[in-house]
């Protein structure tokens, strides 16, 4: 409502009526105790995306992907692809009660898992950094509870919520970056938040816009049906995406690969 209308109300009806219209105290809030927004884009300097099927891209398609129309990541994910060996999820959580609410647990609940994807691999290598990770989830564990980030072995990490909790007042926001990893298989999962709301404990579920999140472990190069390189690995070739024979790279691990791709 404009300032002119507010001034007119004040002049015509007095301070009490003005306050009742413009200075109403916030009413009780219904719905879930925490608003969870998954619309924020993660910064991906580099990534690996595997497809369940073998993709035979033509040069014209590679040229389109190289110019970012569409982005190769989006193209592959729209065709059933999964990041590997980890996927990053950015969430913004916001308190939605008059009193403070507290997040006391987050779990990645697996819906199904099977052999890692082997159709095609898109490998975009990066020389840059990554966003700071808030929590880590090991999908190879029997239960994938939130862990403190850091270290090479997820099984040795401390449970995040044994030492932390996340308290949110009304409208207070916090950004979380979650990493889910697998070194053994492909998994689909959803996130379960456990929230204390006054005297009640509530479970809130988060998925990827109506679908489960996905992650796959990486196979050796020669186990993929087709292979595409991008990122800094192709700068010597003029940049963009290039197709290579997976057998030419043998049994090397894509995640630790540091060689050239040839031009």
PLM features per residue range, with description:
Residues 1-65:
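Membrane-aqueous junction of the first/signal-anchor transmembrane helix
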Residues 73-84, 92-101, 116, 167:
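Short, solvent-exposed beta-strand/turn "edge" segments of beta-rich domains on protein surfaces
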Residues 99-107, 117-120, 147-149, 188-190:
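Short, hydrophobic/aromatic beta-strand segments
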Residues 104-113, 150-154, 193-197:
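Short acidic, flexible loop segments centered on an aromatic residue
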Residues 112-154:
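Long, charge-dense
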Residues 140-153, 196-263:
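Acidic, serine/threonine- and proline-rich intrinsically disordered appendage/tail regions
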Residues 155-187:
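Low-complexity, intrinsically disordered segments enriched in Ser/Thr together with acidic residues
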């Amino acid at each position: 409502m404009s300032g002119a209308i507010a001034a007119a109300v004040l002049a015509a009806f007095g301070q009490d009526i003005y306050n009742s219209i413009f200075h109403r105290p916030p009413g009780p809030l219904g719905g879930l105790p925490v608003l969870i927004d998954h619309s924020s884009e993660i910064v991906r300097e580099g990534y690996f995306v595997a497809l369940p099927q073998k993709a035979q891209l033509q040069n014209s398609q590679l040229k389109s992907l190289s110019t970012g129309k569409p982005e190769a990541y989006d193209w592959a994910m729209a065709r059933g692809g999964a990041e590997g060996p980890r996927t990053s999820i950015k969430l913004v959580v916001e308190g939605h009660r008059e009193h403070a609410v507290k997040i006391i647990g987050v779990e990645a609940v697996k819906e199904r898992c099977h052999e890692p994807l082997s159709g095609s691999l898109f490998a975009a290598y990066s020389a840059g950094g990554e966003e700071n990770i808030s929590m880590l989830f090991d999908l190879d564990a029997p239960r994938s509870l939130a862990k403190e980030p850091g270290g090479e072995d997820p099984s040795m990490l401390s449970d995040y919520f044994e030492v932390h909790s996340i308290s949110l007042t009304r409208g207070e926001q916090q950004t979380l970056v979650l990493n889910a990893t697998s070194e053994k298989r492909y998994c689909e999962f959803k996130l379960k938040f456990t929230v204390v709301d006054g005297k009640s404990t509530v479970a809130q579920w988060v998925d990827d816009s109506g679908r489960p999140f996905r992650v796959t472990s990486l196979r050796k190069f020669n186990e993929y049906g087709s292979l595409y390189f991008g990122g800094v690995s192709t700068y010597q070739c003029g940049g963009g995406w290039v197709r290579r024979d997976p057998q030419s790279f043998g049994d090397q691990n894509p995640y630790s690969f540091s060689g050239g791709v040839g031009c």
